[in-house]
Amino acid sequence: MPAEMQAPQWLLLLLVILPATGSDPVLCFTQYEESSGRCKGLLGRDIRVEDCCLNAAYAFQEHDGGLCQACRSPQWSAWSLWGPCSVTCSEGSQLRHRRCVGRGGQCSENVAPGTLEWQLQACEDQPCCPEMGGWSEWGPWGPCSVTCSKGTQIRQRVCDNPAPKCGGHCPGEAQQSQACDTQKTCPTHGAWASWGPWSPCSGSCLGGAQEPKETRSRSCSAPAPSHQPPGKPCSGPAYEHKACSGLPPCPVAGGWGPWSPLSPCSVTCGLGQTLEQRTCDHPAPRHGGPFCAGDATRNQMCNKAVPCPVNGEWEAWGKWSDCSRLRMSINCEGTPGQQSRSRSCGGRKFNGKPCAGKLQDIRHCYNIHNCIMKGSWSQWSTWSLCTPPCSPNATRVRQRLCTPLLPKYPPTVSMVEGQGEKNVTFWGTPRPLCEALQGQKLVVEEKRSCLHVPVCKDPEEKKP
C-alpha cells in the first residue's frame, strides 16, 4: 500500500537534548534499569566516563540526582505509561514519552542521546460531568444523646431535591447537632489516680529463695465515686508487681577481630570490587551485651583496565528485493517467483559473540506491482494519535481506503521436489479500482480536533 494512503499511526515530537558528557568525574554504576531509566548498583565516585564505560552494560550520573546515562550504544527506551487524562469528565487528551539513551552515537532517525519523544492521544475517563443535587427540608430533632446532665441531639436531611447525577453531590452537611439538657444529675464513677513510684527491689541478685520484685500502688480518688446518686467503684487491682531488672550477670559487649586479606577482583574486565571481612569474636558478646558496631565487610574498587566484550546485535532487515523469476516475466501473471532480504550484524567489539541466525531471508511471492485490480472500500480506521502532540490545536484523523481484492492464487507452491510445500505471499502495490466515495477514488479522510490538550513537560525536571 503506498505511504500516502496510510493513516498516521505514531505522532512524534523530539524535545530537550541533554548536554554532552565530558571527561569530568562521574558516579559509576553496574546496571542501567531499562524499565525506570535509573542507575543501580553504585560502583564508585569520581570515576572517568571512559573508565566506567569500559563495560557497555554499566551506566553513570554526572552528579547525585542527575539523569542516569547508559554506557551502551544509543537506543530508544520503552514508552512510558500514558499520563492522566487532561480532564476528569467528557473528552480530553493524554501524553506519553520515551528517551534516546546511550553514548557514542545516535538513535534511529539521527536523534541525539537525551532527546525526549512525545505521543498524544484522545482519552475519556468518564462520559459525563457531575451535576450537583439539592437538599430536602430538615427532619425533626432526635432524642438527647444522654439520660442525665447535658448532651446533644441531631436532625438530618436527604440529598434528593433533586438527586445528584454522574458522581455529583449536595454542598453542605447532611446532619446538624445542638445542645440538650435532661435536667438530671449524673452519678460520679470512680477513677484511678496515677501509679505511685516503684519501691526498691526486694533482692540484690537472681537465683534466691524468692523472685526479687518491685511494687507500686494507686488510689481510687481521681475522682472518688459519688454517694448520691451512687457511682461505680474503680475496677482493677490497687497494687502492681514486676520482676527486678539489671541484676548480675553483667552483659559483655562484642569486639571486632582483624580484617581478612583482600579477595581477588570480582571481574576480569572493566571495574570491579575486592572484599575484606572481619568477625565479632574479640570478644564475642555475652549475657545480652551489644553486638559489634560497624560493618563486617568492606569493599574496595579494582580496575582491570581491559575493555569487556560486546556481543554483536542484528540490525533491522533490509527491504525485500523485487519479486522475479529467472528469464520469465511474472508481473500480474499468477506465476510464483522469489525475493530476498538481508541484514547485518553490528556493534561487536572486544571479541564479543557474533550474531546468531541467518544473514539472508528468502521467500516465494506473486508479483502484483502496479496490477489493475477490482477494489472495495474498507471500514473506517481507528482514530490516529493527535498531532502535533504539544499543541493546543492538535487534530486526529481516520480514513477509509480503496483496498484491492487480491486474486485467488494458490497459497503454497512446491518449487523443488522433496522439499515440501512453501507459503507464497503477494508483493508489490496494486492499483485498485473502486466506485467514487464522497468524490474520492482512493482515500476518504475525516479530521477532528483534540480537546483539552495538556502541556508537555520533561518528567526529569525537578518540581519547585
Swiss-Prot record:
BP-aspect Gene Ontology terms: complement activation; complement activation, alternative pathway; positive regulation of immune response; positive regulation of opsonization
SUPFAM superfamilies: TSP-1 type 1 repeat
Residue stretches making up the TSP type-1 domain: 24-72, 73-130, 132-187, 189-251, 253-309, 311-372, 374-457
Gene assigned in the entry: Cfp
Ranges where the record places region Interaction with Complement C3 beta chain: 346-354
PROSITE patterns noted in UniProt: TSP1
Designated name of the protein: Properdin
Disulphide connectivity of cysteines: 28-52, 39-68, 53-71, 85-123, 89-129, 100-107, 128-166, 144-180, 148-186, 159-170, 201-244, 205-250, 220-234, 265-302, 269-308, 280-292, 323-365, 332-371, 345-355, 386-450, 390-456, 402-434
Subcellular location: Secreted
Function per UniProt: A positive regulator of the alternate pathway of complement. It binds to and stabilizes the C3- and C5-convertase enzyme complexes. Inhibits CFI-CFH mediated degradation of Inhibits CFI-CFH mediated degradation of Complement C3 beta chain (C3b).
Domain notes: TSP type-1 domain 0 binds to TSP type-1 domain 4, and TSP type-1 domain 1 binds to TSP type-1 domain 6. These interactions mediate multimerization.
InterPro entries the UniProt entry points to: CFP_TSR-0, CFP_TSR_C, Compl_asym_regulator, TSP1_rpt, TSP1_rpt_sf
Keyword set includes Oxidoreductase: no
Annotated Gene Ontology cellular component terms: cytoplasmic side of Golgi membrane; extracellular space; secretory granule
Transmembrane spans: none
Major place of residence: secreted
